[in-house]
Amino acid sequence: MESCSVTRLECSGAISAHCSLHLPGSSDSPASASQIAGTTDAIWNEQEKAELFTDKFCQVCGVMLQFESQRISHYEGEKHAQNVSFYFQMHGEQNEVPGKKMKMHVENFQVHRYEGVDKNKFCDLCNMMFSSPLIAQSHYVGKVHAKKLKQLMEEHDQASPSGFQPEMAFSMRTYVCHICSIAFTSLDMFRSHMQGSEHQIKESIVINLVKNSRKTQDSYQNECADYINVQKARGLEAKTCFRKMEESSLETRRYREVVDSRPRHRMFEQRLPFETFRTYAAPYNISQAMEKQLPHSKKTYDSFQDELEDYIKVQKARGLDPKTCFRKMRENSVDTHGYREMVDSGPRSRMCEQRFSHEASQTYQRPYHISPVESQLPQWLPTHSKRTYDSFQDELEDYIKVQKARGLEPKTCFRKIGDSSVETHRNREMVDVRPRHRMLEQKLPCETFQTYSGPYSISQVVENQLPHCLPAHDSKQRLDSISYCQLTRDCFPEKPVPLSLNQQENNSGSYSVESEVYKHLSSENNTADHQAGHKRKHQKRKRHLEEGKERPEKEQSKHKRKKSYEDTDLDKDKSIRQRKREEDRVKVSSGKLKHRKKKKSHDVPSEKEERKHRKEKKKSVEERTEEEMLWDESILGF
């Protein structure tokens, strides 16, 4: 109890010069500390001691003292006595040479710090732990530890001797546990944490993981599981997406190389002679030269279906979603490309046939047989494209069956549009040939065309100039359509028949002019047909005139019945209004007739025709006025 009271008095700053007399002559650490304090009492007064040793903090050791039991155990301990003796030794030699004192302080300070902790397990300066004495020894000899010592020496050299306080430097030191990520300001707290159960568990986990990480991983799955366990032990979220994405990208890249190698292989087949590739009949087999270049294509597949099934199994075994869309699109594009080449090869081959001699073109009588240009197409086209078809209909039906068997919708519009455009183009050529043919008939003697009695038949000279791709049945259909059009032209007039008398008057002059021009342009063989057509027109006009006369007679009978029921006063007023309107209309009609006569005088080529038209117009004007009068009576209610 005496030693405890002495140490407490000593730490509180109430110790006196005669305290050493009451202490027993033992070699305990508190006694030695009090003796050191007694010897240095002349240098250090009580106020300075009170500042160093307080009830809550020991500045010499840099330890926080929260409870009374902590204060008692700390001040009675050997570590506190060593720190106090070291502190008073340093301050007792304050009047000596500064350089020597600084060097001695650094060495003693390091020794003091290493005395508390085993050097083979922990380096207080570098804050590093060691699992064996050999590793610790190599660390102390190494550059890192030497560099830290040098930095500490430089910091102490820069500071002034009077301002240097080792207890402050010691108190500012922090201790960090990198496994638990915790920092401590005191060495005792750090030691207690290192000896705790929580730290020991984490340390054992980390050591086991480090030992296991040295062995080589048999597969990526084991490596990934190891990595996840380490991250979970550290309390971090494991990131497993980067390796998975890499695998998927590699897989898709490899299978795309397989897909892309096929068109390259076909291009290679086109460049090299055909004999080198006759052994590969199937369109989807890859040649041995290309398979050797691919790193993973060790297996040869009889068809794409087997290869796709193998790929799906591999992807499912790896836990990935098999992507089967890129290969399907590729097949569709290849098929449509093949059929389009077959369709496009037709016009090209026909153009080439026109450029060849006539004897060479005679050997290809059927229009849909494969031409020499089609025989030069690459051999990687589907097997059904090698067949010869008698007509395009058979070829189209075969194509539709193939597309339906593959589960695709057959596209038949591209050939249909081309046919319609070709047909219209051919019809225009046939129509355009007729005036040219007639011009040739006018220029050439008549003897050359005696064999063709029909007026619209085409000569062999013009037929030879047409392209050879026209089928025989097409020409027959066109001739039949032309003859049908001629019959319809003869049966029906080129312009509709007018319904009213005004339209008849307006169109009579144009009909006469057109008839004369048509007579000059047409040949002698067509005169009879046109005369018959004019007779029919005149008969229709007469019918319309008779119907116009019958209508007003019926209307007059109806209006006479109505007159008997009306008043006489109203009759007088209406008759006066009717006469005024009739006079105005007669004036307007006479002015219009004069204007029309002037216009038609310029158009009529001869005087005889003018006289005929005047007579017809006078009759029509009289009929028109009577008709208008009857029409007005019917409207006004007479």
Curated annotation (Swiss-Prot):
<dbReference type="InterPro" id="IPR013087">
    <property type="entry name" value="Znf_C2H2_type"/>
</dbReference>
<keyword id="KW-0862">Zinc</keyword>
<protein>
    <recommendedName>
        <fullName>Zinc finger matrin-type protein 1</fullName>
    </recommendedName>
</protein>
<dbReference type="Pfam" id="PF12874">
    <property type="entry name" value="zf-met"/>
</dbReference>
<keyword id="KW-0479">Metal-binding</keyword>
<feature type="compositionally biased region" description="Basic residues">
    <location>
        <begin position="592"/>
        <end position="601"/>
    </location>
</feature>
<dbReference type="GO" id="GO:0008270">
    <property type="term" value="F:zinc ion binding"/>
</dbReference>
<feature type="zinc finger region" description="Matrin-type 2">
    <location>
        <begin position="121"/>
        <end position="151"/>
    </location>
</feature>
<feature type="region of interest" description="Disordered">
    <location>
        <begin position="496"/>
        <end position="638"/>
    </location>
</feature>
<feature type="compositionally biased region" description="Basic and acidic residues">
    <location>
        <begin position="544"/>
        <end position="556"/>
    </location>
</feature>
<dbReference type="InterPro" id="IPR003604">
    <property type="entry name" value="Matrin/U1-like-C_Znf_C2H2"/>
</dbReference>
<dbReference type="GO" id="GO:0005634">
    <property type="term" value="C:nucleus"/>
</dbReference>
<feature type="compositionally biased region" description="Polar residues">
    <location>
        <begin position="500"/>
        <end position="513"/>
    </location>
</feature>
<feature type="zinc finger region" description="Matrin-type 1">
    <location>
        <begin position="56"/>
        <end position="86"/>
    </location>
</feature>
<keyword id="KW-0539">Nucleus</keyword>
<feature type="compositionally biased region" description="Basic residues">
    <location>
        <begin position="533"/>
        <end position="543"/>
    </location>
</feature>
<keyword id="KW-0863">Zinc-finger</keyword>
<keyword id="KW-0238">DNA-binding</keyword>
<keyword id="KW-0677">Repeat</keyword>
<dbReference type="InterPro" id="IPR036236">
    <property type="entry name" value="Znf_C2H2_sf"/>
</dbReference>
<feature type="zinc finger region" description="Matrin-type 3">
    <location>
        <begin position="172"/>
        <end position="206"/>
    </location>
</feature>
<dbReference type="GO" id="GO:0003677">
    <property type="term" value="F:DNA binding"/>
</dbReference>
<feature type="compositionally biased region" description="Basic and acidic residues">
    <location>
        <begin position="571"/>
        <end position="587"/>
    </location>
</feature>
